[in-house]
Amino acid sequence: MTEIGTVIDGKYEILREIGRGGMSIVYLAMDTHLNKQWAVKEIRKKGNGKNDEVVVNSLLAEANMMKKLDHPALPRIVDIIDNGITIYVVMDYIEGESLDKVLNEYGAQPEEQVIAWAEQLCEALEYLHSQKPPIIYLSLIHI
């Protein structure tokens, strides 16, 4: 786990944790050169599992594939940093609240809003499926 205040690659200052998964932690970071916020996904190369190398290689392949995509509903990958122990994937920071938080705080949303979200999701999936070869997204948890 990277400590808050750490500067990665001489320019990305870690501000706070914004998400966590099985093999990665996502931080909000500030590019100290451009004064711009980014999301930085930290992927530890060694964990406690025997399949760590496979998982890390899979996450790295996903990041390299995402670098080539250009769609307004998908965050751009702008940098991949490998310091030998940890891989950092720097991507667009998209402000807002998670759907889970919106539902917990505000309850069911109006039908028009849900339809608008579904249309945006379908447009992003259509874009992914139109790639050569098609990109099949298996988990919609974090979209």
Placement of each model-derived feature along the sequence:
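Protein kinase glycine-rich loop
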Residues: L15-G22, V26
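Conserved N-lobe loop of protein kinases adjacent to the ATP-binding glycine-rich P-loop
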Residues: M30-W38
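AlphaC helix of the eukaryotic protein kinase fold
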Residues: R44-K68
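Activation-segment/catalytic-loop signature of the eukaryotic protein kinase fold
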Residues: I80
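Conserved short submotifs of the Hanks-type protein kinase catalytic core
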Residues: G84-S98, V102
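Activation segment signature within eukaryotic-like protein kinase domains
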Residues: W117-A118
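Protein kinase catalytic-loop region centered on the HRD/HxD motif
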Residues: E123-I136
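Conserved small/polar residues in nucleotide/adenosyl-binding loops
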Residues: I141-I143
